[in-house]
């Protein structure tokens, strides 16, 4: 069931949180899929007589869940989507009452179905047939076997699949969670993906408001829900509990809209219960909201460091897949071959599309990196001060270059030019005590290396140039002058 009335409430009161998007927006993204929900949909197709209906094997067992999963998974791969399938584990103890009610409704539906069949009411037969659906362990194992042949990752949740999907999404292992149950948001799913069913309308984007969008893929963002409703996560959980969930009863007379108004006024369930008239709004005996709140905040899940190694896609086992589908499930051989060819093509297409997207993104990043930021024009005073600073720095740099050159030459026992400044000569005298008798007038281009001298070996003698290197500040000056000129033009 999920959360009663939540989707419509969000469409009316937080419309920006629901975005209709095309399936192409999921290209290259990982998504966690509530597999149990999909199996239920495929089994319902039998009763509704849709494309997967009335499919059985030689034993008379329905195979619509296998055919439906094969078809939709193939479409996912063709769309460049990487699915991670998550299956339900043992239900929480608090869900026991809800499961009992479901069993009772199923028994009642079976009785109504028999009556409808007796009178031949086709519409009523379809309606009651859907209500009798129960996913068996055998059907779940069939789907897992199929996905194993396809090389898809499957995860068995210790409890609720929606909670495990939310955990994957919160830790960034998947982009979003594919499910129709709104309680995935209550478990903290940052992004819920609804109606990913590849129907004709699922890839159409309309201008209709979220409340009027019955078809088409929807992206629901939890952060936008909280900001639009102006509540925090704890209050959102309380809103879901008051609206009606699978884990406790509901308070008569309080639906989603009323619950929201009460939360805005009283902030939490504890304060609400103290202020409402419990004669008009009686509290049911199974309304243990504190335990339910804790379940939503800290559900039983496998931590991602325990299961992240399971999220791997492997190459399909085509031969085993074909043998199982054709021989054991009585699938048409030509149809199976067609699926296999589509999967092979989709893998090549997805790889190339992702590669093209990578290079396109990298190219844009390089382009953006080399864009020259706009500079404000310099005032006349700033221009004058800049020129003075450059001239002063350049003058100091010339002296520094000559002195450093002298020090290097003296240190290595090489002759020194007599054109050095007096200050440079003083610095040289202080640092050349080891060679006091060396003449300073020997020309550089007539140096003869002493091969026997340890200080003049090829390895440790620096190369000498007759021309002093250009002072390092000259390029800086040219650049600054160019900037000033550009400013003048502006």
From Swiss-Prot:
Name of this protein? Flap endonuclease 1
Can you tell me which residues bind DNA? 47, 72, 160, 244, 246
The subunit field of the Swiss-Prot or TrEMBL record says: Interacts with PCNA. Three molecules of FEN1 bind to one PCNA trimer with each molecule binding to one PCNA monomer. PCNA stimulates the nuclease activity without altering cleavage specificity.
Sequence segments annotated as region (Interaction with PCNA): 351-359
Looking up SMART domains in the UniProt record yields: 53EXOc (SM00475), HhH2 (SM00279), XPGI (SM00484), XPGN (SM00485)
Establish whether keyword DNA repair is in the entry: yes
Disordered: region residues:
364-396, 421-490
Family in the record: Belongs to the XPG/RAD2 endonuclease family. FEN1 subfamily.
Which top EC class is given? hydrolase
Q: Name one GO molecular function term.
A: DNA binding
> What organism is this sequence from?
Cryptosporidium parvum (strain Iowa II)
């Amino acid at each position: 069931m999920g959360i009663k009335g939540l989707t419509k409430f969000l469409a009316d009161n937080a419309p920006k949180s629901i975005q209709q998007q095309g399936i192409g927006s999921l290209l290259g993204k990982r998504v966690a899929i509530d597999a149990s929900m999909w199996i239920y949909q495929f089994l319902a197709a039998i009763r509704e007589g849709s494309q997967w209906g009335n499919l059985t094997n030689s034993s008379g067992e329905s195979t619509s869940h296998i055919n439906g999963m094969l078809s939709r998974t193939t479409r996912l791969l063709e769309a460049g989507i990487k699915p991670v399938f998550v299956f339900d584990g043992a239900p929480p103890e608090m869900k026991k009452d809800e499961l009992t009610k479901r069993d009772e409704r199923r028994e009642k539906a079976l009785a109504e179905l028999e009556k409808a069949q007796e009178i031949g009411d086709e519409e009523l037969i379809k309606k009651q047939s859907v209500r009798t659906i129960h996913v068996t362990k055998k059907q779940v194992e069939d789907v897992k076997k199929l996905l194993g042949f396809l090389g898809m990752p499957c995860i068995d949740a210790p409890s609720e699949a929606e909670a495990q999907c939310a955990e994957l999404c919160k830790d960034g292992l998947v982009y979003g969670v594919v499910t129709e149950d709104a309680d995935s948001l209550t478990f903290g799913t940052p992004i819920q993906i609804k109606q990913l069913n590849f129907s004709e309308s699922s890839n159409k984007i309309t201008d209709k408001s979220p409340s009027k969008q019955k078809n088409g893929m929807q992206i629901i963002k939890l952060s936008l829900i909280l900001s639009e409703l102006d509540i925090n996560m704890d209050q959102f959980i309380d809103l879901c509990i008051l609206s009606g969930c699978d884990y406790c009863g509901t308070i008569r007379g309080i639906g989603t809209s009323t619950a929201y108004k009460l939360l805005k006024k009283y902030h939490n369930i504890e304060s609400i219960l103290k202020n409402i008239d419990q004669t008009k709004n009686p509290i049911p005996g199974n309304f243990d909201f504190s335990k339910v709140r804790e379940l939503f905040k800290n559900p039983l899940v496998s931590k991602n460091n325990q299961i992240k190694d399971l999220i791997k896609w492997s190459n399909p086992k085509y031969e085993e897949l074909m043998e199982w589908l054709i021989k054991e499930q009585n699938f048409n051989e030509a149809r199976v071959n067609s699926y296999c060819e589509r999967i092979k093509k989709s893998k090549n297409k997805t790889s190339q599309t992702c590669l093209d997207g990578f290079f396109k993104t990298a190219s844009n990043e390089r382009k953006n990196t080399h864009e020259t930021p706009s500079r404000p024009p310099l005032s006349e005073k700033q221009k004058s001060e800049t020129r003075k600073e450059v001239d002063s720095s350049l003058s100091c740099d010339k002296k520094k270059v000559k002195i450093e050159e002298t020090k290097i030459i003296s240190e290595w026992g090489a002759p020194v030019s007599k054109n050095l400044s007096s200050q440079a000569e003083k610095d040289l005298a202080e640092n050349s005590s080891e060679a006091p008798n060396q003449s300073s007038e020997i020309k550089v281009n007539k140096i003869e290396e002493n091969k026997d001298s340890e200080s003049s070996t090829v390895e440790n003698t620096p190369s000498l140039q007759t021309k002093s290197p250009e002072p390092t500040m000259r390029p800086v000056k040219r650049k600054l002058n160019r900037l000033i000129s550009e400013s003048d033009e502006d």
